[in-house]
Amino acid sequence: MIEVNRNNSISLYPSDTETEDVKEVNIPYPGLSIESLINQIYGAYLLGYDIIRIRGKSLISFDDRELIKLAMRKLVGLEIVDEDGSNIISQFLLDANTLDAEKILRRMSSIVAGMYKDTLLGFQKRENGIEKLIASRDDEVDRQYFLLVRLIRSAMMDQKLASKLNLSNIDILDYRIAANHLESAGDYIADFATALPIISHDKLIKEITHAGTLVEIMQEKSVAGFINKNRVESNEVVSMYAKFNELLNLTKEISTKTEIYKQDTTIAVLISIFSMDKIARCWVDIADLIKPVYLTAPLKNA
């Protein structure tokens, strides 16, 4: 069997290759706890199971049923196809061959970028309630992250799928790491958004916003560089991180010289600085995944 891959290369497979059986798993209810059962659902999803059955020895309580449904709603492509008093059957309805790791990563990056931009804008305008909006979007980042991890794990176990996705073994590993950094950045931004409303000093707001704007550009360059394998942008991110550190140190100096009478404000400044640094480090780490030119280009006179 001959198949054309996304990079226009051709893959040959034995003509007698059989279609893979649908992967199914049964999870007993009640388990040790509802939290343990939900973790099993997440684990089965990430391991690539197509059908996940919750098998009850007794009726599934209303509260537990709602928690199970809430957990399943967090998993892209997983839909409840049947249920009764003691059973819940869900199925993954997306075709892995139609998914694209790059598009999912870009989607994650777009959501995270929007979270960060709105956090800074809300901070500048001193708007209330922005942290709740950010937290809800962080949940969507997690959903996309789980989908990408599922796809990557499936590709690791299925060379045919990996070939269709145009991903080498190293690419698969790099996408997994990059996605993890994006997911972590979403969590750090949620922490960042929680700390900012407490800060009200004009000079501190100005300096934190200045440093924060630099982090925004770092994300754009690191993710674009990673996807396009552009080492130049990777080097720019590292240089920008050095400049960012200078701005952070300046913010720390201002905070020590500024008369802050509330302990909560002092703690909020420290949390915001610490959170911004963790976010920036995520972009540096993604930039570090970009292969050097000598690993992506053929050697001359070889």
What are these regions (language model features)?
Residues M1-A302:
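Cytosolic, long alpha-helical scaffolding segments
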